[in-house]
């Protein structure tokens, strides 16, 4: 599961890096503790509509805010989005909530890295036989080469059925992070991690004319050289009220709960790299 991440790049940086045509004005600022249901910067492509309706044939790449937590087009209310922050790679092409978006509305969700919480082995019982509550240690996972983590996502455009169709506020753009079985450093901390779009596959991944699910899935099977690294961070990240660069600072080793390599989930055989 990916339930928290950091995204500190400016719109200018993202627009240049991903060769964006249109940059929306209402993009969020740097966020070091991105949580579900907030707006996040996303890159996607849309066909330009003609003034009188219809497809002009032109495709534009956009950098725009999407609310994290996908609301399917058929949903009766937007609250369902808080339960749709992740789409599993294994079922994204078939699951009713995600299949339609996966066919034609794929996106990139740029990140500095993501957070996961490691739960150590249960502590010894307290006096009286009461079980001690294990203390979860947050870790920050990022590219070892310092590059941007380009998470694979899907997005949907939902209209509030109770609102006037011509009311701009009736429309909501939402997204979900595609996740896969964790490997490498992530596999010792949590069993899931975000799926990454390889740089050479970005153009094809965003192409709205690519509607074959199998072809889209194949794009995500390509890996790049490099690996994922993880380090312990302060429990301050546990609260979404905390949001500043200090959340990314490594915790001194004397304060971090070590990850037990013998009891932590191992990376699947032959899958030792994320990027």
What are these regions (language model features)?
Residues 1-275:
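Short linear sequence motif anchored by a di-proline
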């Amino acid at each position: 599961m990916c339930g928290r991440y950091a995204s500190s790049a400016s719109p200018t940086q993202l627009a240049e890096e991903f060769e964006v045509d249109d940059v929306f004005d209402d993009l969020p600022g740097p966020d070091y503790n991105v949580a579900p249901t907030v707006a996040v910067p996303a890159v996607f492509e849309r066909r330009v509509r003609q003034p009188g309706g219809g497809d002009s044939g032109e495709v534009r790449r956009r950098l725009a805010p999407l609310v994290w937590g996908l609301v399917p087009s058929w949903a009766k209310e937007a609250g369902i989005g808080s339960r749709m922050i992740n789409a599993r790679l294994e079922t994204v092409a078939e699951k009713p909530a995600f299949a339609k978006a996966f066919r034609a509305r794929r996106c990139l969700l740029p990140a500095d890295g993501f957070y996961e919480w490691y739960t150590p082995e249960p502590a010894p019982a307290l006096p009286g036989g009461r079980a001690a509550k294990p203390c979860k240690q947050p870790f920050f996972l990022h590219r070892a080469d310092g590059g941007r983590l380009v998470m694979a996502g899907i997005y949907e455009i939902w209209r509030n059925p109770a609102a006037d169709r011509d009311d701009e506020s009736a429309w909501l753009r939402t997204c979900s992070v595609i996740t896969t079985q964790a490997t490498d450093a992530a596999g010792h901390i949590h069993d899931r991690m975000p799926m990454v779009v390889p740089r050479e596959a970005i153009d094809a991944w965003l192409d709205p004319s690519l509607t074959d699910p199998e072809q889209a899935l194949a794009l995500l099977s390509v890996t790049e050289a490099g690996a994922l690294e993880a380090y312990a961070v302060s429990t301050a990240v546990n609260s979404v009220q905390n949001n500043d660069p200090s959340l990314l600072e490594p915790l001194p080793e004397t304060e971090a709960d070590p990850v037990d390599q013998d009891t932590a989930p191992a990376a699947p055989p032959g899958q030792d790299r994320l990027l």
